UniProtKB/Swiss-Prot annotation:
Biological source species: Aster yellows witches'-broom phytoplasma (strain AYWB)
Keyword Cytoplasm applies: yes
Gene name linked to the record: aspS
Name of the protein: Aspartate--tRNA ligase
Function: Catalyzes the attachment of L-aspartate to tRNA(Asp) in a two-step reaction: L-aspartate is first activated by ATP to form Asp-AMP and then transferred to the acceptor end of tRNA(Asp).
Aspartate: annotated segments: 197-200
Transmembrane segments: none
Length: 576
């Protein structure tokens, strides 16, 4: 609580001119003009300029103050001669009469004012200094505002903010678990939750009906620019709402965010595509619709006779673009290498000039009306699933190379009607073994085909995609034990394994379970998108490196033998 003479920096304006104020903060920048000293004082609200004149009895002492020293100052608000329109306090400055050093800073390992220019390793090791940079701090302040907006939307819809345990049980959710050994039960382990999935379903069984929390989740998986081993999600579960109602609620959350964070309107309802449509049009289940390229079927324009069947092994699909001048021979060779190396596919390209098709397969084109002059066409042929996946990746690359993405727009859409199961052919497990595309608690759209044709089953699942990022995923859940046990059986779980790992859930489903479903929104990704950064580490206070290390804490680290003995653990290998 501030005293009546104290202010945050950004509260001060010309209406305070002549007032004596007390301010506290960090010395951010300083300039010595001989008979006058100028300092920038930074607090959590912003920056204000301090003026120290030569007649100040502390002048010599103040001149020696190092950057990032924490001070308290007393001074008078005066009008600034050279105003700074880029600062909220740019019309005023503080004529300092007294300064007290609260904590002196040593020589800094990085320049706080320009910390983004330091090596990432240095920034992460001294993250508490990096976070002093106002631009870096802005990411976390926005994170707060985003979280608060979501919370307010849910509270006005009668949701309860409830917690779930961190020490949990290992369950299959698609990634490796972080395990915590038990001292009391030697040889047994807790698992850090990959999500609060089962607990939030138990809340519904307990009759709470509307739950949410800002949940911490942990997944031991390979990292990338938008993924960390621990992350936050807005976890939501409801009873008695159908899929459309949950999606509508989620849209309300996002619309409120656009209004509160960007002061922009957002139209509802969002576009919806089925999983099949998304792959056939864009080659991805999380397409960036700011990219105008769509996969087109050109098969009917080709003469697929016996001879050409040696070249075309199925449907002929691809893209056509008009920016031919930007595509060099080297770039075309790079594209061909991509398809051959990663997908064992042959990429064909041809261009239309002066009403004539030029390219290696022009003799097979029986109708060139699909192509305009100066347009280039890229096509591949093969099995549908393979060419869609390949073209989806190529679509992103081609749009990036040709600057086709309209970055002034925001593209949100739903992907629905996912398959309930998938098969992973590369796996060493038995062929055609089924795996849950989302998780094994997702309700099927039609449970009657589970026994006869489970591969054709669709899921009551929905993903929210924003500019090519999956920012949310949810589903309706199974609410009877018979269907849940059948799903486990189809996934290859033995009865004993089901009982050991999910017996509590099967038991709970027997005592009256409301129809329920929910969604989890990736908070880190949402903040990343709202702050227009490409690196998720920017929006996390203390992130890990790409190799899952905390450089500041030097974690993970070895523990001493006494700790291992207490847990009755013995290391199999010495990795030091």
């Amino acid at each position: 609580m501030k005293t009546k003479y104290s202010y945050y920096n950004n509260q001060l304006t010309l209406i305070h001119q002549g007032k004596i104020v007390f301010l506290k903060g960090f010395i951010f920048r300083k300039r010595n003009l001989g008979k006058t000293l100028f300092f920038d004082l930074r607090d959590v609200s912003g920056i204000v300029q301090l003026l120290v004149k030569e007649n100040n009895p502390q002048y010599d002492k103040i001149a020696l103050i190092k950057l990032e020293t924490v001070v308290q100052i007393k001074g008078q608000v005066i009008e600034r001669i050279n105003k700074n329109p880029d600062l909220p306090t740019g019309d005023i400055e503080i004529l300092v009469s007294h300064i007290e050093i609260l904590s002196e800073a040593q020589t800094l390992p990085l320049n706080v004012f320009q910390s983004q220019e330091s090596l990432e390793e240095t920034r992460l090791k001294y993250r508490y200094l990096d976070l002093r940079n106002p631009e870096v701090k802005h990411f976390l302040i926005q994170r707060h505002h985003i979280t608060q907006s979501i919370r307010q939307t849910l509270l006005k819809n009668d949701f309860l903010e409830l917690e779930t345990p961190i020490l949990s049980k290992s369950t299959p959710e698609g990634a490796r678990d972080y395990l915590v050994p038990s001292r009391i039960y030697p040889g047994n382990f807790y698992a850090l939750p990959q999500s609060p999935q089962l607990f939030k379903q138990l809340y519904m069984i307990a009759g709470f009906e509307r739950y949410f929390q800002v949940a911490r989740c942990f997944r031991d998986e390979d990292l990338r620019s938008d993924r960390q081993p621990e992350f936050s999600q807005i976890d939501i579960e409801t009873s008695f709402l159908n899929q459309d109602e949950i999606m509508s609620l989620t849209e309300e959350i996002i619309v409120d965010l656009f209004a509160n964070i960007w002061k922009k309107p957002l139209l509802q309802p969002f576009l919806r595509l089925t999983y099949q449509q998304a792959f056939e049009l864009y080659g991805s289940d999380k397409p960036d619709l700011r990219n105008p390229l769509k996969i087109t079927d050109f098969t009917t324009f080709f003469d697929t006779n016996t001879y050409s069947q040696n070249i075309f092994a199925g449907k002929i699909k691809g893209f056509k673009v008009s920016k031919t001048a930007f595509l060099t021979r080297r770039k075309l060779d790079e594209y061909q290498l991509f398809f051959s190396k990663h997908f064992n596919l042959k990429l064909f390209s041809f261009v239309k000039k002066n009403d004539k098709i030029i390219g290696g397969i022009s003799q097979f084109i029986q109708d060139d009306s699909f192509l305009k002059n100066e347009e280039i066409c890229f096509v591949v042929s093969g099995k549908k699933d393979i060419i869609h996946k390949a073209l989806g990746i190529f679509r992103t690359k081609l749009a990036l190379d040709l600057s086709l993405v309209d970055t002034t727009q925001e593209a949100l859409l739903w992907i629905v009607d996912f398959p309930l199961f998938e098969t992973i052919q590369e796996d060493l497990s038995p062929p055609n073994r089924l795996y849950s595309l989302h998780h094994p608690f997702t309700a099927p759209r039609d449970a009657t085909i589970l026994k006869s044709n489970p591969q054709k089953a669709l899921a009551n699942a929905y993903d929210l995609v924003w500019n090519g990022y999956e920012v949310g995923g949810g589903s309706l859940r199974i609410n009877n034990h018979q269907t849940q046990e059948l799903i486990f059986s189809l996934l290859g779980f033995l009865q004993e394994e089901v009982q050991n790992r999910f017996g509590f859930l099967i038991e709970a489903l027997k005592y009256g379970t409301p129809p329920h479903g929910g969604i989890a929104l990736g908070l880190d990704r949402l903040v990343m998108l709202f702050t227009k950064t490409n690196n998720i580490k920017d929006v996390i206070a203390f992130p890990k490196t790409q190799s899952a290390k905390d450089l500041m804490l030097e974690a993970p680290s070895a523990v001493n033998q006494e700790q291992l003995n207490t847990l009755k653990l013995q290391l199999k290998c010495n990795f030091n």
